[in-house]
C-alpha cells in the first residue's frame, strides 16, 4: 500500500548524488506516487476516488439522438407581432388589402398560440391554432386560415 505523505523538501543541502532520495532508483519512475496518471484508481487509489471523484467510473445519463429532438414549432401571437416588420423587410410576409399575410407553415411553424398582444390586422396561414390565438387575431382585424392536414 502506498504511504501518503508530503513530498520531500526541495531545499537541497549540498550537492549530493541522490539529493536526499536515498538510493538512485527511489526518485526515478513513478513508484513513489503510485503510478502515472489514473493508474490504480480501481485499486490502491480507491479511497481518493470515493472522496474526490465519486462519478469517475460508470456511465451517467445519455445523449438523446438529434433525430428525435423536436424543434421549436410553435409561435405565440406576441412573438408574431414582434417579427412582422422583419418578415416584411425580408420578403417573407406580404402586404395585401391592408393586411399583412404570413404563411407560418412555410416558416416552419406548426401551431399558433395565444400568448401576447397584437394590434395590426394580419392574415395568418398555419396548420393549427388555439382558440385564444384565433380570437386575438380576429379582434385585431385579421383572420386565421387553418391548413387541412394530409392523411
Swiss-Prot record:
This is Large ribosomal subunit protein uL15. Part of the 50S ribosomal subunit. Keywords: Ribonucleoprotein, Ribosomal protein, RNA-binding, rRNA-binding. One of its GO terms (biological process) is translation. GO terms for molecular function: rRNA binding; structural constituent of ribosome. Signal peptide: none annotated. SUPFAM superfamilies: Ribosomal proteins L15p and L18e. Belongs to the universal ribosomal protein uL15 family. Pfam families: Ribosomal_L27A. PROSITE patterns: RIBOSOMAL_L15. Binds to the 23S rRNA. GO terms for cellular component: cytosolic large ribosomal subunit. HAMAP family: Ribosomal_uL15.
Amino acid at each position: 500500500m502506498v504511504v501518503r505523505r508530503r513530498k520531500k523538501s526541495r531545499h537541497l543541502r549540498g550537492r549530493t548524488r541522490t539529493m536526499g532520495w536515498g538510493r538512485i532508483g527511489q526518485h526515478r519512475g513513478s513508484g513513489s506516487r503510485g503510478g502515472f496518471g489514473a493508474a490504480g484508481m480501481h485499486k490502491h487509489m480507491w479511497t481518493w476516488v470515493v472522496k474526490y471523484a465519486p462519478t469517475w467510473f460508470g456511465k451517467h445519463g445519455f445523449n438523446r439522438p438529434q433525430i428525435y429532438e423536436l424543434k421549436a414549432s410553435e409561435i405565440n401571437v406576441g412573438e408574431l407581432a414582434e417579427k412582422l416588420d422583419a418578415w416584411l423587410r425580408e420578403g417573407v410576409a406580404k402586404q395585401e388589402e391592408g393586411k399583412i399575410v404570413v404563411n407560418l407553415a412555410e416558416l416552419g411553424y406548426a401551431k399558433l398560440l395565444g400568448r401576447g398582444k397584437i394590434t395590426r390586422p394580419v392574415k395568418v396561414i398555419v396548420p393549427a391554432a388555439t382558440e385564444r390565438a384565433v380570437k386575438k387575431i380576429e379582434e385585431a382585424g385579421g383572420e386565421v386560415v387553418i391548413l387541412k392536414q394530409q392523411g
